[in-house]
Amino acid sequence: MIKAQRRILAGWLFISASIGCGDVTSEQQTTGSNIERLFVLRRTVWPSQDINVCWDSAGFDSEKNWVRSAVERSWSLVANVNFANWGNCSAGSNGIRITIDDVGPHTGGLGRDIDGVVQGMVLNFTFSSWGRSCQSSSDSRGFCIRTIATHEFGHALGFAHEQNRTDRPSTCTEPAQGEDGDFTVGSWDLNSVMNYCNPKWNGNGELSSTDIQGAVLMYGLAPSLTLASLPS
């Protein structure tokens, strides 16, 4: 079913493109009307719509719920991908394993390359050492946690940094970071949540039309949506 949706959506995207006339800004990672590009590493796209998520760190129940809510209101809202469970990790847990640490948030790779990897994703909830501007208020801390979660789960779905693209404009001066993708949709997207050159930090955690279209192309359309409901 997912493969069939991808074939349909690939045709839709092609037609649409044809007719279309202190350091909180840094992240450590080891790894309009026109349709724009999203940068994806295809071999890392998860084969199942159900992706297990678990926590290797205890506590922070409220913050963990903020992360889950941010993901469910972004990637899971538009694409046929279900981040499931969200409980504590066990020794043999697969899927996305999240550690909480006061360092730059990052993933250990893209997509399913982090399947079952301890510290496959690292998120920061305290900002005592890294990203201290996120401590300025409780609202700021919540905003940072949610916005970063949306970005990092983009990596967990297989999406690379947009500024890594070789055809980025000269106005984008952020250095390439992490692993590159091997597939693009449309043209370079300033507004992607995966783009460090986005004038809004991590896109304020709000998926651009490109982010949405790329996620749907890779994973299929969320069951509650129709193609007509997606941004053009």
Placement of each model-derived feature along the sequence:
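Zinc-dependent metalloendopeptidases
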Residues: 22-232
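Bacterial N-terminal signal peptides that target proteins for export
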Residues: 1-11
